[in-house]
Curated annotation (Swiss-Prot):
Keyword vocabulary terms for this entry: Ribonucleoprotein, Ribosomal protein
Region span, Disordered: 250-308
Protein name (Swiss-Prot/TrEMBL): Small ribosomal subunit protein uS2
Molecular-function GO terms, alphabetical: structural constituent of ribosome
Amino acid sequence: MAVVTMRELLESGVHFGHQTRRWNPKMKRFIFTERNGIYIIDLLQSLSYIDRAYEFVKETVAHGGTVMFVGTKKQAQEAIAEQATRVGMPYVNQRWLGGMLTNFSTVYKRLQRLKELEQIDFEDVAASGLTKKELLVLSREKAKLEKTLGGIREMQKVPSAVWIVDTKKEHIAVGEARKLNIPVVAILDTNCDPDEVDYKIPGNDDAIRSVTLLTRVIADAVAEGLIARSGAGKAEGDKAAGEPLAAWERDLLEGEKKADEAEAPAAAEAEKPAEAAAEAPAAEAPAAEAPAAEAPAAEAPAADAEQA
C-alpha cells in the first residue's frame, strides 16, 4: 500500500510552488510547469522522494533513534505539535533557540531547571516557603521555559534525524544539524536549496493542509518504526532502547500479546488427541509379537521324530 496517494497530494495543494520570481534555480529539476506566474511541482517525483524519506525515518526509529520535528511558522505549529506528541517525539514549534543542537549540554541544564520548577506548587503559598512575589517570578520563568522548551522536555541527547518545515525559515536549525552530521528530512518548496537537505520532499511548505499531510506521513513512519523496534526487543527478550512508546502503541502491542496468549491453549488442546492417536498403535505392538514367542512349541514334534 502506498504511503500517500497522488490524489491526497493534489487535494492538499502539495503541488503549488512559489511565484516564478521567487525561486531557487537548483529546484528546476523538481518543477513540472508554470501556471499563472506560479511554479507547479512534479508530484511524481514527490511521491518517490516521500517513499525514500518514509523508509529512512522508519529504519532510524526502528534502530532506537529519535526524530525531532521542527516548524515554527504559523502554518506548521499545530501540525508539528500534534503529530510529534502522537508518536512521542521531541518537537520545536515556537522559537528555535540558537545552540539547541550544537550546545545541547546547556539546553539540557535549562530542561532540568524546567523540571525543578514543575515540582513547585504555585497555588499553596504557605507550603512552598516563598513569598508571593518570588512565586510570581518563578511562575513566569516556568511559563517561558515551557513555551520554548516544552516540546523537548524529555529529550536526553541530540536526535538521530530532524524533520523540518521550511528550510529557509529554519536555516539555523538546518545549519546546526549539518554541523553535527544529523540527517535532515524536509519539505522543499521552489525557493529552497536542495543541497542543504539529505532526504528531500518537493512540495508546498506554506499551505496548512500540505504541511499537515506531509508531517502526518513522517509521524506514521515514526509509528511504524516504533512498532518494529518493540517487536525486535520482544524477540530478543530485552526492552527496546530509546524513547518510550506512545500510549496507543502500547495498547496495540498489548492487544496482539493477549490474542497470542488466547490462541496458545487452543493449539495445545488440538495436539492432545493427535498424541493419543499416535500412542495407540504402539500399545498394541506387543500383542502382534506373541505368535513369535510360541514358535519353539511348533518345533517340538520334529524333535520327537528324530528320537524314534
